[in-house]
Curated annotation (Swiss-Prot):
GO cellular component, one term: plasma membrane
Matches recorded under NCBIfam families: PRK05286.1-1, PRK05286.1-2, PRK05286.1-4, PRK05286.2-5, pyrD_sub2
Signal peptide region: none
GO biological process per UniProt: 'de novo' pyrimidine nucleobase biosynthetic process; 'de novo' UMP biosynthetic process
Protein name, as recorded: Dihydroorotate dehydrogenase (quinone)
The species this protein was found in: Pseudomonas paraeruginosa (strain DSM 24068 / PA7)
Length: 342
């Protein structure tokens, strides 16, 4: 069924197809039809971040930016869902066209630029949803907020989403917001993490529960830079790291139509780079922080590869676009077949 739907959707522009898919998945969720789209994955419970996941395969942020189809995605068998990236104020994102398919490489290039309806809209959608599984909310800064004041945007979003999130992801690694990736380094990272940690403690006292914080990083750092980030996360008391966001590299798409478009590359070509980052993090962290792996999972074996590299959970996005909900069960089955899970 999904193969036919994909053929029809791929006749549309990528962004139109994306918007229509969100509408259809949302409608299917309201009608309870999405459970029919693919066999449910086997139960493979895992406890991470003090949360109980029915399986370790989640939806990565970016697909449902505004939380418009939470119930729909919740019926597809994901072990958890991450929505966003959301910013304090609504913003249109970058000029179109800004989303490109590279089907020959099972890849996508995007330069969306955090287009979203703002945190208040997202929260209204979260509160209207019936989904009661693990829900991550991914937060970012507005385009027109200077990088030196980015912490204000992150704290604003954290304040607002805290009560409704199972965990919160801080996105400092999108390549499509100028200057954002500079927050991954040095004093900028240290100051951001310190502010987030202090606000997390304040909010935990206010709300009577501690919501974990995850930091999402890029795949384009050197091993030394990744090691420094890992040390900073441990020192600041962060709860998890998501590895990785999209890459600025173009290995694997050279010469393909749209292969030279500006933006972040996701899908199969980023897989090895992302998995390498997971391995470096695992070596540096030594189990002190769980790793959520994302990047290039287009087959079940790729999800198992991430777990074997040291991740506790995985997320899919581009692979879901190309393979549909069947990839969820395929990934869960492949992870279940590992001789030992981390």
């Amino acid at each position: 069924m999904y193969t036919l739907a994909r053929q029809l959707l791929f006749k549309l522009s990528p962004e139109t197809s994306h918007e229509l898919s969100i509408d259809l998945i949302g409608a299917g969720g309201r009608l309870g039809l999405n459970r029919l789209l693919a066999p449910r994955p086997a139960s493979l419970p895992v406890s991470v971040l003090g949360l109980e996941f029915p399986n370790p395969v989640g939806l990565a942020a970016g697909l449902d930016k505004n939380g418009d189809a939470i119930d729909g995605f919740g019926q597809l068998g994901f072990g958890f869902i991450e929505i966003g990236t959301v910013t304090p104020r609504p913003q249109p994102g970058n000029p179109k066209p800004r989303l490109f398919r590279l089907p020959q490489a099972s890849a996508i290039i995007n330069r969306m630029g955090f287009n979203n309806h703002g945190v208040d809209h997202l929260l209204a959608r979260v509160r209207a949803a019936k989904y009661r599984g693990v829900l991550g909310i991914n937060i970012g800064k507005n385009f027109d907020t200077p990088v030196e004041r980015a912490v204000d945007d992150y704290l604003t979003c954290l304040d607002k989403v805290y009560a409704d999130a199972s965990y919160v992801t801080v996105n400092v690694s999108s390549p499509n917001t100028p200057g954002l990736r500079s927050l991954q380094f040095g004093d900028s990272l240290k100051q951001l993490l310190e502010a987030l940690r202090q606000r997390q403690e304040d909010l935990a006292l206010r709300h009577g529960r501690r919501v974990p914080l995850a930091i999402k990083i890029a795949p384009d750092m050197s091993d030394e830079e990744t090691a420094l980030v890992a040390a900073a996360l441990v020192e600041a008391g962060m709860d998890a790291v998501i590895a990785t966001n999209t890459t600025l590299g173009r290995e694997g798409v050279e010469g393909l139509p749209h292969g030279d478009e500006a933006g972040g590359l996701s899908g199969a070509p980023v897989r090895e780079k992302s998995t390498h980052t997971v391995k470096v993090l695992a070596g540096e962290l030594g189990g002190r922080l769980p790793i959520i792996a994302a990047g290039g999972i287009t087959e079940g074996a790729h999800a198992a590869e991430k777990i074997a590299a040291g991740a506790s959970l995985v997320q899919i996005y581009s692979g879901f676009i190309y393979k549909g909900p069947a990839l969820i069960r395929e990934a869960v089955d492949a992870i279940a077949a590992l001789p030992r899970r981390n």
